[in-house]
Amino acid sequence: KVPRPTVLSFDLEVYSSDPNTFPKSERLGDKIFQISCILGKQNDSEQNYEKTLLTLGEPSSQVTGEDVEIRMFNTEDDLVVGFTDYIQETNPNIIVGYNIFGFDIPYLIARATAPCMCFREFSKLGFLKDTEANLKTIKWSSSAYGKQEFEFLDAEGRLFVDLLPLVKRDYKMDTYTLKAISTYFIGETKDPLSAKGIFKCYDVGTKRKKDGTFGKKAKKAMGIVGKYCVQDSVIVLKLFEKLQTWIGLTEMAKVCNVPIFTLYTQGQQIKVFSQVYKRCMYDG
């Protein structure tokens, strides 16, 4: 029987101080300003998802959706540590996203290291609350996955799953954008919001009035991005279910006698060697 793990889907929204270029983690003016967190059990329907938005500013709940819990922070470092606090609070078994090994996790690591200077607190992502996760670099390549190189935090007790390389391995598509993949497999997509639109919403959404509060225009702007960010994470969790990712990974791990994370971080040879070693052990 396959267990029903608790799954957390997350997504970042990042601001670029130069609207004509992609956000850069080393650029001081760029920052993470929203993190959507969608929590569910394996085989849950969307109505049972717990939706949370961690954010700078003050998004309008009428825009993001009344079913979304909004947690507001004053600074980027508070937001990043708030993400760790959320993980410790909800204690998911699996943390999933789309291209999280290629962007989200390396970006979080870089920002937490500098300029936020909160890496030690941020890295406490494992089951043991006061234990810092080890920073590791994965480098390998295969015909199925291509060249893989990324940084990640080895958080004890948590399984990180990036759907992008799994989809690329199993399906031949013209494009692998989340919009294209979600439209094809689940018939859903997210609101049309360009990168420049996101940056503009941040500029508007972080402006305070003279009394220090946020006006309706600012709240609406941050709410628009917040809704978009939440949609991203909901879609990823639905894809995780639709593609039967958990069942596929657990069954393959059983057959190959390897940990699940090894399936997409160490190539094909480890699967063969592990079975050979098991046979040798049985034969003495």
Kindly give the residue locations of the regions a language model identified:
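Short secondary-structure boundary/capping segments
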Residues: 23-29, 104-118, 126, 253-255, ...
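Common nucleic-acid-contacting/processivity interface regions adjacent to the catalytic cores
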Residues: 199-284
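Active-site-proximal helix-loop-helix substrate-binding element of RNase H-like nuclease domains
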Residues: 47-54, 61-70, 74, 91, ...
